[in-house]
A protein has these predicted regions:
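Conserved hydrophobic/aromatic "anchor" residues
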Residues: 22, 60, 85, 124, ...
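Short, P/G- and charge-enriched loop/turn segments at secondary-structure junctions
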Residues: 32-34, 134-137
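Conserved glycine-rich acetyl-CoA-binding loop
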Residues: 69, 82-96, 103-105, 109, ...
Length: 158
């Protein structure tokens, strides 16, 4: 598995994976996804299967960060893994890279929302040190509940 930063030619495969992984109202629009990726205060990581000439996107993660008066905070916008590639450590590695990007940008904490029914994702976040901080009843297009999880980030690893 190759992990690398997003490149402009990745968008079609990235959005095809978005459509495969999420249905409305959870799925992001193309315009919103482009906006997230273009944000200079964000990082998008790609997990790519490299079988000779055939490269396929196995997953991706998008993290953003914002400077606030009490310090920079980060937010995991999404982590998505192709169904055929799940349970193989890809999401954990994408999460690690997203955290490293946020840490390098000065973030001292990282937050995310997760569908209350996404047991696999909840298990991953808990195993990586995230703690539930709340629940929003009408988060996903005001139709579905989500848990709020957060984790403190230490200083960048030297």
């Amino acid at each position: 598995m190759l992990y690398r930063p997003y490149q402009p030619g990745d968008f079609a495969a990235l959005y095809a994976l978005e459509e495969l992984c999420f249905q409305p109202p959870i799925r992001y629009s193309r315009a919103w996804m482009r906006k997230l990726i273009a944000n200079p205060n964000s990082a998008t990581w790609i997990a790519e299967k490299n079988a000779g000439e055939n490269k396929t996107m196995a997953g991706f993660a998008i993290v953003e960060w914002t400077a606030l008066p009490k310090g920079t905070v980060a937010y995991i916008q999404t982590i998505e893994v192709h169904p055929a590639s799940r349970r193989s450590g890809i999401a954990a590695e994408l999460l690690r890279r997203a955290e490293d990007s946020a840490r390098a940008a000065g973030a001292r904490s990282i937050w995310l929302h997760v569908d209350v029914e996404n047991a696999a994702a909840i298990q991953l976040y808990r195993s990586r040190g995230y703690a539930q901080r709340g629940r929003e009843e009408h988060y996903y297009a005001r139709h579905r509940p989500a848990f709020v999880y957060a984790k403190p980030l230490g200083p960048p690893v030297q």
